[in-house]
Design a protein with these regions (language model features):
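Short acidic (Asp/Glu) and glycine-rich catalytic loops that position anionic groups and cofactors
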Residues: 199-200, 277-282, 337-342, 359, ...
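Extended, hydrophobic alpha-helical segments in both membrane/secreted and soluble proteins
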Residues: 53, 298, 302-370, 378-382, ...
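Enzyme catalytic cores with a strong preference for nitrogen-chemistry domains
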Residues: 20-318, 329-338, 345, 370
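Active-site adenylate/phosphate-handling loop in enzymes that bind or generate adenylated species
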Residues: 141-145, 150-162, 169, 191, ...
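Acidic/polar loop patches that form or flank catalytic/metal-binding clefts of enzymes
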Residues: 230, 256, 422-424, 458-459, ...
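A conserved beta-strand->alpha-helix junction
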Residues: 263-270, 340-345, 353-398, 404, ...
Length: 483
């Protein structure tokens, strides 16, 4: 790259940034290039996460990039919750970060990563700049979210307002996720001479969230006159789904790069100088998904990662002949493939002929194994066990719920025997009004539709029957029977 070399030796703590350098520092060219590593880390699997970062850096090195940036807490996985309070975990994270720092001694791209970081007995959610074989700077997150699914104030110490960090001749304004949501941190970085804002994120998927992120980034760009690079993680972690959708805007708020959602991607972003302003060049631009496609792909990714990251061989679903279990099975096949989805139809004496036909048709369309286990013997056994206790009480919902609980018992027994995780099928409309049976149709380790209203269920069925896109492992064409 024809970089100039100048010796540096400094150890300083300024404005919430720990700067630790003691090696020769290279300068970026007039056309600096930053690679965004939109990767899918796993909470607690430090070795696998480090390998993802290594692979992203190798790819960026082939592209001639100067710096690689990841999402929030990419080393530990996000959100790590109480795992970060264990000293053994903190030590393992530190060892991993030092190993990644050593990787940068080859003169290739620097790394801007994120990890739980202990300093002076304080635990920070920190961005770390690695270059020349060293940790060049540690930038703690200032604004810790404490609402909804976030409880970072319980775990981390907030950092002070940060200063800009010099990287190969360019002053970086480094922020982590919530730091960007208000004006203060970006303004402080601008006043300290930052020439570009780099934001590392662990921002989960919600409808219209991508527009909110871009709008906030535009506000920061307009306020500071600086370009902004937004790197978000992708993947499922327990009940959360991270959609990625990383992007770059220029100092005027114009969108110059837009990553895809729900898929891992490493892409180089090139910059040039325009009247002393670092200007991102137009790059990858991916169109936004419509609502139903976005929701469907979020469901697929969430289930896929929950199953794979917890090492389940597959899933088991009670197929009733209804729309909820049919779309759940379709999502499961699109996430895992038909060979990892085992469906069970469990008819009672009251199950309609149409339900039996629809369950069989759903299994046929998806190519999944379907067992049929009649629950009448279980119902009669339970009713016989309880007959003496119920003798003076007329039949009511108790007997109806025995049907659901018999099915739950069968599914959980098969799960125990074969190791497949049971996926429950109730939707958000049912859950919100209590239309479900405890220890019956609520049995399961994961519920695909827990945040999907019934009206949306029908929309997702229509979308899936009309569409098949990259990343879906199920069949093309109709996936949910229509009646």
């Amino acid at each position: 790259h024809g970089w100039a070399v100048r010796p540096t030796l400094r150890l300083a703590l300024f404005s919430g940034v720990f700067s630790l350098t003691g090696s020769q520092e290279t300068s970026m060219t007039d056309q600096p290039t930053i690679a965004i590593a939109q990767i899918n880390p796993t909470v607690g699997d430090i070795a696998a996460n480090v390998e993802l970062i290594r692979a992203a850096r190798a790819q960026a090195q082939d592209l001639g990039c100067d710096l690689v940036m990841t999402g929030e807490l990419a080393v530990s996985g996000y959100p790590p919750e109480d795992l970060v309070l264990k000293k053994s975990f903190q030590d393992a994270v530190k060892k991993a970060v030092l190993g990644l720092a050593k990787l940068t001694s080859d003169g290739g791209p620097g790394l801007l990563i994120s990890a739980p970081w202990v300093d002076d007995a304080h635990l920070y959610n920190a961005a770390l700049l690695l270059d020349g074989g060293k940790i060049k700077a540690v930038v703690p997150k200032c604004v810790l979210p404490n609402y909804g699914v976030f409880d970072e104030k319980r775990l981390f110490t907030p950092g002070d307002q940060p200063g800009a960090v010099n990287f190969r001749g360019i002053k970086l304004g480094i922020m982590t996720c919530e730091d960007m949501w208000g004006a203060d941190v970006a303004q402080t970085l601008m006043k300290d001479g930052a020439e570009v804002l780099l934001v590392l994120n662990g921002s989960p998927f919600e409808l219209d969230k991508s527009h909110m992120r871009i709008d906030l980034a535009r506000e920061r760009a307009h306020e500071t006159g600086l370009p902004l690079v937004y790197a978000n993680q992708v993947g499922g972690q327990d009940e959360l789904v991270f959609d990625g959708g990383s992007f770059v805007i220029n100092e005027s708020g114009d969108l110059k790069v837009q990553f895809p959602v729900f898929e891992s991607r490493v892409e180089a972003v090139s910059f040039g100088w325009d009247n002393d302003i670092l200007a991102p060049k137009p790059g990858l631009m991916v169109d936004a998904l419509d609502e139903n496609e976005a929701i469907y792909k979020a469901l697929v990714l969430g289930l896929r990662d929950y199953v794979n990251k917890n090492y389940f061989p597959g899933v088991m679903i009670g197929l009733s002949g209804g729309v909820d279990s049919a779309i759940t099975a379709a999502v499961a096949v699109d996430a895992l493939g038909a060979d990892r989805v085992h469906c069970v139809m469990m008819p009672s004496p009251y199950t309609s002929k149409e339900s039996l036909e629809d369950a069989a048709e759903a299994a046929k369309l998806l190519g999944v194994k379907l067992d049929t286990i009649a629950i009448q013997p279980a119902m009669e056994a339970f009713e016989g066990l309880l007959r003496e206790q119920f003798v003076q009480h007329p039949a009511d919902t108790t007997e109806e719920n025995i049907q659901a609980r018999s099915r739950g018992l069968i599914l959980m027994a098969m799960s125990n025997k074969f190791g497949y995780m049971v996926v429950s099928t109730g939707n958000k409309s049912e859950m919100s009004v209590g239309y479900a049976t405890l220890y019956g149709d609520m049995c399961g380790g994961y519920n695909v539709l827990k945040d999907v209203y019934k009206t949306r269920v029908y929309q997702l069925c229509a979308w899936r029957n009309a569409n098949h896109t990259d990343g879906l492992m199920g069949p093309t064409g109709m996936a949910v029977p229509e009646r």
